[in-house]
């Protein structure tokens, strides 16, 4: 059965003042779809971009980390980073109901 569900997107910063992140607040999708969650950031000291997934009532689960430009693929999830554009994204493929969660990008 195909149904629409929400992916909630949040943001988290590292410990340095003067940083900012931008992400959409929610994404609606259907099972089997491909969803791209974008993250732009501004920071004076950048070491990498991490992505986390958190289900209601649970602890955040680490998904990926990019320190260098390019695409990192891990199963159905891929993450991309462009340091020169201060931009990254998380790509979720073959979306499943269990993917309904909050997603966080975090700058280090």
UniProtKB/Swiss-Prot annotation:
Residues 19-108 form the Ig-like domain. It comes from the Eukaryota. It holds the Pfam family V-set. It is found in: Cell membrane. The lineage of its organism: Eukaryota, Metazoa, Chordata, Craniata, Vertebrata. InterPro entries: Ig-like_dom, Ig-like_dom_sf, Ig-like_fold, Ig_V-set, TCR_variable_domain. Residues 1-18 form the signal peptide. Its main location: membrane. The gene is TRAV1-1. This is T cell receptor alpha variable 1-1. GO terms for biological process: adaptive immune response; response to bacterium. Alpha-beta TR is a heterodimer composed of an alpha and beta chain; disulfide-linked. The alpha-beta TR is associated with the transmembrane signaling CD3 coreceptor proteins to form the TR-CD3 (TcR or TCR). The assembly of alpha-beta TR heterodimers with CD3 occurs in the endoplasmic reticulum where a single alpha-beta TR heterodimer associates with one CD3D-CD3E heterodimer, one CD3G-CD3E heterodimer and one CD247 homodimer forming a stable octameric structure. CD3D-CD3E and CD3G-CD3E heterodimers preferentially associate with TR alpha and TR beta chains, respectively.
């Amino acid at each position: 059965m195909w149904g629409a569900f929400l992916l909630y997107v949040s943001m988290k910063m590292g410990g340095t003042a003067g940083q900012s992140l931008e992400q959409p607040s929610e994404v609606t999708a259907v099972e089997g779809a491909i969803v791209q969650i974008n993250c732009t950031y501004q920071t004076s000291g950048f070491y990498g971009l991490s992505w986390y997934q958190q289900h209601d009532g649970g602890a955040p689960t680490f998904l990926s980390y990019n320190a260098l430009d390019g695409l990192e693929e891990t199963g159905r999830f891929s993450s991309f980073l462009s340091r020169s554009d201060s931009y990254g994204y998380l790509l979720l493929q073959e979306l499943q109901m269990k993917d309904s969660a909050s997603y966080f990008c975090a700058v280090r």
